[in-house]
Curated annotation (Swiss-Prot):
Changing D106N: In hc186; restores fertility in spe-27 mutants by rescuing initiation of spermiogenesis. It comes from the Eukaryota. This is Serine/threonine-protein kinase spe-6. PROSITE patterns: PROTEIN_KINASE_DOM. Keywords: ATP-binding, Differentiation, Kinase, Nucleotide-binding, Serine/threonine-protein kinase, Spermatogenesis, Transferase. It catalyses: L-seryl-[protein] + ATP = O-phospho-L-seryl-[protein] + ADP + H(+); L-threonyl-[protein] + ATP = O-phospho-L-threonyl-[protein] + ADP + H(+). Pfam families: Pkinase. CDD domains: STKc_TTBK. One of its GO terms (biological process) is signal transduction. The gene is spe-6. Changing S120F: In hc189; restores fertility in spe-27 mutants by rescuing initiation of spermiogenesis. Its EC number is 2.7.11.1. It is an enzyme of class 2 (transferase). Changing R211Q: In hc165; restores fertility in spe-27 mutants by rescuing initiation of spermiogenesis. It comes from Caenorhabditis elegans.
Length: 379
């Protein structure tokens, strides 16, 4: 390997990644995100010059490595529409890496370029239809996301710019056993996800299920349609329970009517359906999709109209620019920090769950990822 590494031992521009079990090599073109334990790069195949994204994660000092979850989920969903193509994964003595399809800017950043920080109705409904299908596919593969939000969905680049991709599975968890049966909930679980979007049950340290991913999807949908959520300015790091209480409050009048003001009435029914779905139930994805179609019909829009970033030259240029750089949602958040100061951040713990069940919670998180070593050099 070449010697272009920074002081932490992480690769820099010009560094050559050599896959351990094949003759493939990738050249690092640029770093587009750098954090305490992880970096994201644009790399190019040294033979074809095709560009990819590469996520690297330091091994030393990383108390909760998550790249292995990305690898496991991308391998499980390989070939499914709207999931970045998994290319290769491996490790060096300093870091683990995963090479995958390059995608464009995330939906959170795109939304913030729009007037009033919301998408048009045709675009929002199309996004929600696509993201609903992504979650159904993920669940069918036996995985929960546990961090559904706009920044974890990106648009494609070039001819794929109308496709919405789901990515960043650092909080994912296997929720079915080898026989395909849903794993019973633990006594207590760590609060996983993002304050603004996590399900009400997560605020009470309950184990999450497929319904909870869809509850987060629902909050994301309201944000895409109306702009920032009512609890967007509450500091969840100081009081996440207040956000949970706000989510409970919008389920009753008079706040319920206010919450749904300006959005298709079908979203009121969507929330009712989700609240009636239990931990062990399979969500009615078809019914939810049908309600999106009904909303489009009632508002006389089609679900085949050009998307906002295809209609708007500024958004289109930004999408092409960011896509060419292969920017991840973390980099988007970094660039837009001043414009989006109150956005919640990913968390693992805010406060501790009840003492009973803590060890079960943590050991289960480890057990769902222990087999990743078999995939570390998988191509």
């Amino acid at each position: 390997m070449s010697e272009q590494r920074d002081s932490r031992g992480m690769p820099q521009a010009g560094f050559i990644i050599e896959h351990q079990s094949s003759d493939h090599k990738w050249k690092v073109l640029r770093n587009i995100y750098s954090g305490p334990f992880s970096d994201v790069y644009v790399v190019a195949d040294t033979v074809t010059n095709e560009k990819y994204a590469m996520k690297c994660e330091r091994q030393e000092g990383n108390s909760r490595p998550v790249l292995k979850l990305d690898v496991m989920v991308l391998m499980a969903t390989k070939g499914l529409r709207g999931f970045p193509n998994f290319v290769a994964a491996g490790r060096t003595d300093v870091y683990r890496y995963c090479i995958m399809q390059l995608v464009g800017p995330d939906l959170g950043r795109l939304r913030r370029t729009r007037p009033e920080r919301k998408f048009s109705l045709p675009t929002a409904l199309q996004i929600l239809g696509q993201t609903l299908r992504r979650l159904e596919d993920l669940h069918n593969c036996g995985w929960l996301c546990r961090d559904v939000k706009a920044p974890n969905f990106c648009i494609g680049v070039g001819e794929n710019e109308s496709t919405v991709y789901i990515l960043d599975f650092g909080f994912a968890r296997k929720f079915v056993d080898k026989e395909g049966k849903i794993i019973p909930p633990r006594t207590a679980a760590a609060l996983m996800g993002t304050f603004q979007y996590c399900a009400v049950s997560a605020h009470s340290h309950k184990d999450q299920c497929a319904r909870d991913d869809l509850e987060s999807w629902f909050y994301m949908g309201i944000e895409l349609l109306k702009g920032p959520l009512p609890w967007a300015n509450i500091d969840g790091h100081k009081n996440h329970k207040q956000i949970g209480e706000a989510k409970v409050a919008i389920r009753s009048e008079p706040l319920r009517s206010e919450f749904f003001e300006g959005v298709p009435k079908q979203f009121n029914e969507i929330l009712t359906i989700l609240d009636q779905t239990s931990y062990f139930d399979r969500p009615n994805y078809k019914k939810l999709g049908d309600l999106l179609s009904q909303a489009a019909t009632e508002h006389q829009v089609t679900l085949k109209e050009p998307l906002d970033w295809q209609n708007n030259e500024r958004m289109q240029q930004k999408a092409i620019f960011v896509g060419e750089l292969g920017e991840s949602h973390q980099a988007s958040a970094k660039l837009d920090a001043k414009d989006n100061a109150n956005e919640s951040m990913d968390i693992e713990f805010d406060d501790m769950p009840p003492k009973e069940g803590i060890s079960k919670s943590l050991s289960a998180e480890k057990s769902c990822t222990k087999n990743v070593e078999t995939a570390r050099t998988e191509k």
